[in-house]
């Protein structure tokens, strides 16, 4: 993948070139979410793949007069008889006085991503990110694993050869990311990042319409001819940003580093020596006594 430079001047410039029916120019829009964890003076930022945008719709949202603040100090927005709460830290705009242009995206969801059915962006006061459902109801954005930690969303352009195709049209020994079920739309084979399924065998009897797919675990599963698959691998994590760390810590994607010897310095090694250097004793006039 090749990542283009992100421009936050105007959302219309970011969305320029996206075909509502799908990308025909070989350039697709992917969305990434960024989660940050901090322990002491160490700050780690994870950037993950979120989904691929298929189409988008633009509409104007005007907060009603019933909007205000509740007893907990949250922003409340009334829409179609339902009240949705927002944290003050998530939004830098006053939703009671400003018009908000929202962009609702329909996308191909990553199986390991959080179960959202759309993302909307506001063009007033910079690019603000608000998740929406299929009925365009605003909701609060939080991490499913940790309800105390919030994350932001970024829109970037990428060059990718990944696209959706019917499994009946692709050849054998083709890597696919996941096989969605045509009945309920859920993926049958949710793969870890960086891995893929392998289309292995095809049944010669066309009336059966069965194809065997090899999973990364080595097992084979039988799928139907009517399923559509996402070609290519699931994109791995882009990068992990971490500041100055000590030797011996697991910071590189969970791989334990090999530290040879013990450095007598507590900054470079957790088993280090003194907090300050050992200097020779000096007299009040600055001369060494020994």
Curated annotation (Swiss-Prot):
Main location: other
PROSITE patterns associated with the record: RIBOSOMAL_L2
A GO BP annotation: translation
Matching Pfam families: Ribosomal_L2_C
Recorded GO MF terms: structural constituent of ribosome
CC annotations in GO: hydrogenosome; ribonucleoprotein complex; ribosome
Subunit details: Probably part of the large ribosomal subunit.
Similarity comment: Belongs to the universal ribosomal protein uL2 family.
Protein name as catalogued: Large ribosomal subunit protein uL2m
Originating organism: Nyctotherus ovalis
Top-level taxonomy: Eukaryota, Sar, Alveolata, Ciliophora, Intramacronucleata
Gene: rpl2
């Amino acid at each position: 993948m090749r990542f283009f430079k992100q421009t936050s001047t105007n959302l219309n410039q970011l969305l320029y070139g996206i075909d509502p029916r799908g990308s025909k120019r070989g350039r697709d829009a992917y969305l990434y979410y960024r989660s940050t964890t901090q322990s002491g003076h160490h700050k780690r930022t994870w950037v993950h793949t979120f989904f691929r945008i298929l189409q988008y719709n633009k509409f104007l949202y005007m907060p009603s007069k019933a909007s205000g603040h509740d007893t907990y100090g949250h922003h409340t927005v009334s829409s179609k008889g339902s009240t949705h709460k927002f944290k003050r830290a998530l939004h830098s705009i006053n939703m009671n006085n400003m018009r908000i242009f929202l962009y609702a995206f329909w996308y191909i969801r990553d199986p390991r991503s959080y179960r959202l059915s759309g993302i909307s962006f506001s063009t007033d006061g910079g690019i603000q990110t608000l998740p929406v459902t299929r009925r365009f109801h605003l909701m609060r954005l939080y991490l499913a694993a940790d309800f105390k930690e919030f994350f932001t969303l970024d829109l970037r352009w990428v060059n990718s050869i990944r696209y959706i195709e019917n499994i009946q049209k692709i050849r054998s020994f083709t890597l696919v990311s996941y096989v969605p079920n045509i009945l309920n739309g859920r993926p049958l084979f949710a793969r870890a990042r960086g891995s893929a399924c392998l289309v292995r065998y095809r049944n010669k009897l066309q009336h059966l319409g069965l194809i065997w797919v090899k999973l990364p675990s080595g097992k084979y599963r039988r799928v139907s001819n009517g399923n559509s698959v996402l070609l290519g691998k699931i994109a791995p994590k882009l990068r992990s940003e971490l500041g100055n760390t000590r030797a011996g810590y697991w910071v590189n994607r969970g791989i334990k580093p090999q530290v040879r010897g013990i450095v007598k310095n507590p900054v470079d090694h957790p088993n280090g020596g003194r907090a300050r250097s050992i200097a020779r004793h000096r007299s009040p006039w600055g001369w060494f006594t020994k």
